[in-house]
Amino acid sequence: NGNPEQHIPMVERYNNLGLYAIPYGVNPIDVVVPEDQRLNPESTGIKLMLDMLHRSRLQFPGMGLGFIKRLMDESLQHCQDRIVSGNPLINIDSVKYQLSRIQAAFTICSGMCAYSVQTSGIEHDLSGLSIEANTLKALVTDLMQESAQISLQLAGANGYRLDHIAGRSVVDSRPFQIFEGSNEMLYAQIAEGITKLMRKSKTANLFDFLSNYPTSNLSAAYFKEQLNFNLEGGIPQRDLVTIGRMIARVISFQFVLQ
């Protein structure tokens, strides 16, 4: 920014491990925000902050879709061109399975994008969408890292080159699992949010609750066997993370179905 009052300098620049296009370093922040650019909360500042945070998390799939699509295209092309014992790599069954995992990630991310487009507009108040926002941010970034790892595996020795897309994608996707809330924390918050709603509705069975929850009522039936158990109080945090992962996948599958 050319205005000295709004300029944020970088006093120390770090050597990035990845994401080379983004400057990474120490920024002392001492700025004056113009009156017409300030955010004025209708009630508490907490609600305004949550609205901004959830909107940011809901828009993660837009980044993830292009990332996963590029990895899917590159990996598919490589497996078609690479010849092993006289046959393309893609003819190997385990390779087909790995490619299908990237394709599944792309499908799930596409469903997330459709939901986000309908939901994350500036005209909507997103302060109450913590479960859905955490689901999109955590799962799509996990899918990005998983797709990158698969692409690196399929690329073989070439993937270990510093300038190869597979190796770079592993490093570049990793920070997104950590910042804006580490994914383990977000999965735990998803589980905590659902258990709180279950107590409020006096429902003990996870499947019964998700069958009536707005963003899982269509998809829960596909996972009845896995979800048909009761959630009691005092769940260890490590188990909350696991339950949150399960719930995130059920909710995301509904976005695909819709």
Stretch-by-stretch model annotation:
Residues 49, 116, 170-173:
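Short alpha-helical scaffolding segments that buttress acidic/His motifs in well-ordered protein cores
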Residues 107-139, 152-153:
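C-terminal helix-coil-helix/basic helical segment that borders enzyme active sites and/or dimer interfaces
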Residues 112, 144-151, 156-161, 169:
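Contiguous mid-protein beta-loop-alpha structural module that forms a pocket-lining wall or clamp
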Residues 157-225, 235-236:
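Glycine-rich phosphate/cofactor-binding loops in nucleotide/flavin-utilizing enzymes
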